[in-house]
From Swiss-Prot:
Gene: tmcAL
Role description: Catalyzes the formation of N(4)-acetylcytidine (ac(4)C) at the wobble position of elongator tRNA(Met), using acetate and ATP as substrates. First activates an acetate ion to form acetyladenylate (Ac-AMP) and then transfers the acetyl group to tRNA to form ac(4)C34.
Coiled-coil region list: none
This protein's name: tRNA(Met) cytidine acetate ligase
Binding of ATP, residues: 81, 142, 167
Subcellular location field: Cytoplasm
Length: 393
């Protein structure tokens, strides 16, 4: 956050945040409301939600949804972390892909026909068409997402400028901590769910407010969220589904339903199920997203109705600082999308999916807290934060 503000000289900062389930196809550690508090305490001025229909998707769709929201909010610059760290290289790679589009598409098809996943086939195709050092490594996850952010900016004819900050010391999938007080999300999650987990172990790697809120959530609700806690629900659901039922679920393609129903029979944990399920053709992340759609019963028809090829249909406001509130007041007449401060009286196919996802997310919380959380989610007004006193209002 500090580097972003230094690089962009921004007046305010806006974060577009996933709801209960993430782009990797797994539940968020804590609720979006707690994560909103974390963001505000770390210097973000406006926190808005990326709907489930965009947030649990491949990088292209995820980026398209996020950029459409930022564009509607009249954001002038976007800043993202990447393994490359040079924004010119992203634009150059996009230019090369456009000029070599026919060759690129042929190579992707060729590598997929050889049994590779779409992600692997795309990465290999880029290796073949990119030769200059001024191109980015498209096998790296943050480079891929940044590439899609810029493509979305260009496709939406936005005047938004892009900046990138180089990630260092810790890579996206690193599972261990290093001695530079920088850790990946993967390593933090692994530590939190280890046998002798302790918040003390992760405190040097995250902001003080984040550590405090993580501990508070676990104390208040008795848990942090990960896939294993949903596995019994997930397995029960699959045991009651037919191949035909599964084929209606979003991202279940090419006979994957038969493999899923076969592997679930002997799996005793989500991790063992994923180990049995994964193949050269299907990446772990791709399969996790499919599993998320099974868990939330998100169908192909529902995603079709959400019209994800277009922009996000609304802006769900989760939190704001005083500066953020001032920005919205000054610009609300220019913002074309409806801004939702609660969802009790609003209806939309995309929001219907979000409500289901929230219900599933809180299913592991004990009653009566679970029902309270579900009711609050629809009526919850944006969290307000006074940045001068560092207190929530």
């Amino acid at each position: 956050m500090q580097q972003t503000k230094k690089l962009t000289h921004s007046d305010i900062t806006i974060a577009v945040m996933s709801g209960p389930f993430l782009q990797r196809g797994e539940p968020a550690l804590v609720s979006k409301w707690y994560r909103t508090k974390m963001a505000l305490a770390c210097g973000v001025d406006l926190v808005v939600e990326l709907p489930y229909a965009f947030s649990t998707q491949k990088a292209e769709t995820f980026a398209n949804g996020a950029i459409s929201i930022l564009n509607a909010l009249h954001v002038s610059e976007i800043c993202f972390g990447s393994e490359d760290g040079q924004i010119e290289n992203f634009y150059n790679t996009i230019s090369v892909q456009k000029n070599e589009e026919e060759t690129f598409n042929r190579l992707v098809k060729q590598f997929m026909n050889a049994g590779n996943s779409y992600a692997k086939a795309t990465s290999e195709a880029f290796l073949h068409i990119l030769s200059s050092e001024k191109n980015i490594d498209m096998s790296q996850p943050n480079n891929i997402l940044g590439f899609q952010y810029i493509k979305a900016i260009l496709m939406q004819n936005s005047s938004m400028q892009a900046q990138t900050i180089k990630r260092f010391a810790s890579h996206y999938h690193d599972e261990t901590f290093n001695d530079q007080h920088i850790a990946s999300a993967t390593s933090i999650r692994k530590q939190l769910f280890s046998e002798n987990s302790s918040f003390t172990e992760i405190e040097p790697f995250i902001p003080k407010a984040t550590a405090s809120l993580l501990a508070s959530y676990k104390q208040n609700y008795g848990t942090l969220h990960n896939w294993e806690q949903y596995f019994s629900f997930f397995k029960y659901k699959l045991m009651t589904m037919s191949p035909e039922d599964l084929r209606h679920i979003y991202e279940i393609e090419e006979g994957l339903e038969h493999r899923i129903l076969s592997k679930i029979q002997t799996s005793s944990s989500f991790h063992s199920f994923m180990e049995a399920l994964k193949t050269k053709r299907y990446t772990w992340t791709r399969l996790q997203r499919a599993c998320t759609h099974i868990l939330t019963n998100t169908t192909k028809e529902e995603i079709h109705c959400a019209n994800i090829e277009q922009h996000a249909p609304y802006i769900r406001l989760l939190g704001m600082s005083q500066k953020g509130q001032t920005y919205l007041s000054k610009n609300k007449k220019k913002i074309e999308l409806p801004i939702l401060t609660h969802t009790k009286t609003f209806d939309h196919p995309t929001l219907h999916i979000d409500r289901k996802a929230n219900s599933v997310y809180f299913s592991i919380i004990q009653e009566p807290l679970r029902t309270q959380l579900l009711k609050q989610d629809a009526t919850h007004h944006p969290i307000r934060y006074d940045e001068t006193t560092a207190k929530f209002l």
